[in-house]
Structure formats: structure tokens, C-alpha cells
């Protein structure tokens, strides 16, 4: 099985788990399914390196499908709250988590594409978003198996935390890109000025 196939299978499993179980309120089984397939995201890159087939295409595919998986997770939660969950506020928060996660990733990718290091990790990145959301969803799902009912509060709290953290991370990255771009432009202007030959005034005189 090729690393790309592992990436595709893993993403398909995450999308299926999120969009089948979460809209029905089956948070525990949805989390179990998603977690099993998320591990493929850790395996595919290592497989490619071990097999000596790492490529730009593989990196692009992995990053792109990560965005698809993230969208499915928060989209599934939004569908639950828009339907049987009957909570428009949390539906909006889940959609915000979906959108902000995509934009946070884009700001870093776009900054790097124009030659900036984007030297900031941010408060909450993809790994933190997934861990916080999936742990909370799984624990909330235990409430349907007779666990304490207060566990059901963990998912709403987690969504608010992820939303706030993603907003802070977005601001951090935008500020960093603005600073780095200003520094890069200033350095480029200084380099151009230093390369421009100085003009000496012409001497005039009478023969």
C-alpha cells in the first residue's frame, strides 16, 4: 500500500466517521472511528520516508486532505447542533471553528509561499484543535452509556475554547506576517539602495 493510498484511506475514514456519527449525536463512536483513522496521518509520512518516496506531491496531498478531515469533524458537529442538538449558538461556534482552522492554516502557507518564515506557532494549532475537540466529544459521548451527565458539557466548552484559541492564533499569525513582511521589504529596499552606484557631480570648468 502506497503512502498516498494510506492518506486517502485515512481521510475517507475520518470524513465518514465525522459525518455519519456526529450528526446523530453518537460522539463516542464517532470519536473512536476518527481516532483510528487519524493515526494514518502519522503513518503515511513515515512510510514515505522509510520507502524513500517522499515527494512534494505527497506533502501537498497530505496537507490538503488534512483540511478536508478537519472540515468534516467540525461540519459534523455543526450538523448535530443545527438538527437534533437544537443549539444554534453552538452550531455557529462549530462553523467558526471550521472556518478559522482553515484560515489559520492558510495564513501560514501563504506567508511561506511569499518567502516569509512565519516564525510563530500560535496558541492553538491543528494538533491542539483535534485533541481538545475529540477528547471532549468522546467523553461527552460516554454520557449516553450511564456516565455522569456533566460530561455532556465538555464538548460545548471545548468548542468555545477552540474557537477562542483559533482566533488568537489567527491574530498572532497575521501580526507576525505583517511584521516579517515589513522587515523583508525594508531589507530589500536597503539592499537595492546599497547596490545603486552613487552619483558624483560633474566638474565644469573653462578651458
Regions found by a protein language model. Give the residues of each.
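Hydrophobic alpha-helical transmembrane segments
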Residues: 1-33, 38, 72-207
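Glycine-rich active-site/cofactor-binding loop and its immediate structural neighborhood
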Residues: 25-59
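Basic, amphipathic juxtamembrane/active-site segments
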Residues: 45-92
Amino acid at each position: 500500500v502506497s503512502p498516498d493510498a494510506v492518506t486517502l484511506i485515512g481521510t475517507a475514514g475520518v470524513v465518514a466517521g465525522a459525518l455519519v456519527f456526529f450528526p446523530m449525536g453518537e460522539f463516542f463512536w464517532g470519536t473512536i472511528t476518527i481516532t483510528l483513522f487519524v493515526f494514518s496521518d502519522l503513518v503515511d509520512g513515515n512510510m514515505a520516508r522509510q520507502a524513500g518516496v517522499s515527494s512534494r506531491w505527497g506533502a501537498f496531498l497530505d496537507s490538503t486532505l488534512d483540511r478536508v478531515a478537519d472540515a468534516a469533524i467540525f461540519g459534523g458537529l455543526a450538523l448535530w447542533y443545527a438538527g437534533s442538538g437544537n443549539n444554534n449558538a453552538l452550531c455557529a461556534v462549530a462553523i467558526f471553528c471550521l472556518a478559522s482552522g482553515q484560515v489559520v492554516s492558510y495564513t501560514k502557507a501563504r506567508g511561506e509561499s511569499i518567502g516569509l518564515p512565519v516564525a510563530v506557532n500560535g496558541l492553538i494549532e491543528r494538533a491542539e484543535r483535534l485533541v481538545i475537540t475529540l477528547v471532549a466529544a468522546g467523553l461527552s459521548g460516554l454520557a449516553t452509556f450511564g456516565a455522569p451527565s456533566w460530561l455532556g458539557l465538555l464538548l460545548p466548552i471545548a468548542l468555545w475554547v477552540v474557537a477562542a484559541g483559533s482566533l488568537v492564533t489567527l491574530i498572532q499569525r497575521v501580526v507576525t506576517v505583517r511584521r516579517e513582511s515589513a522587515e523583508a521589504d525594508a531589507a530589500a529596499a536597503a539592499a537595492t539602495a546599497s547596490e545603486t552606484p552613487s552619483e558624483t557631480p560633474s566638474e565644469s570648468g573653462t578651458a
